[in-house]
């Protein structure tokens, strides 16, 4: 457990640094473009790079040294940060450079993440796995609390160049902890022939398709995450537009999300998890959608922070219930391939939502929000007519759709049979 804790600490520090940089780059991109599309495309290129890697990441991690793969992922991310810093220093940084960096980080980050996840079972005894997984949840939510808050304070003081320097130091901490530790490799498996390897790539899809209850579960979760990511694509630009580009407003919302997630995870660990998992997952869908609806209707941090806290409170609950359903329905030796297939489907939906949401907001909804027709229908009263109103309309629409998925799922009998 000591070795895992040291590596975990390095990953926590590195993730906080990444959140600081991502936050600063979001502010820089908004200052340069004022475009929801520009921000959404960063997520698009990151997810686009992950999709083909997801198909083969399991084979890569099983074949090559996982410790070196983790260092490779951190090293590539550090090089991307150096590249951005040099371009900024030369006054040559453009928005498309962020897309290139997102593509690079997305692909290598997928391998790095899987190498880290699959190393846990070789570092931690079975009795400590639950504790280790709880610590991993803290990496994301803890970074979500501290990263944006630090960036909101540091960005006005040290600028993008200073933020990049801090990020490089955190990458160094992650790589140093890996160099100080030894991660045992699992026993090598017999090499499969080429045909078998290609068959493995489609096994997860075939396994889900074979069982009607799993098909229905995947459909429900895919539709939910599609609307979640569709609204999420305009989340940052909506806050920045509504707040006049305030870094403090964006940081406060991000911190509230982290606190809500940590609170939900702590509650879940004390409770021990639900028994009627499918209905609890749907309740999480409804709760998240309701909270996001309130968030989208708000126009200041006074509304955004409590609404975001309540929204994030639901995700550890719905996420754990969904994962438990899959684990309950799929044999352990098949779970990796099935989870990879599910991940690929969700990534595809995320790519589509990121590609469509930004242009829809910029070219249709934001211009429509300043027309007389917008006010005459009552939308002006609900969402306002200032900058960000069109994005708020889109965000609330997606939140209501998330609620609809949760309510509609109550009438689906097949997933309840799992």
Segments and roles (model prediction):
Residues 101-144, 148:
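Cytoplasmic helix-loop-helix junction between adjacent transmembrane helices
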Residues 1-4, 183-219:
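Juxtamembrane intracellular "pre-TM" segments in multi-pass secondary transporters
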Residues 42, 52-56, 63, 69, ...:
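C-terminal transmembrane bundle of multi-pass solute transporters/carriers
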Residues 14-15, 46, 136-140, 257, ...:
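Structural signature of transmembrane alpha-helices in multi-pass secondary transporters
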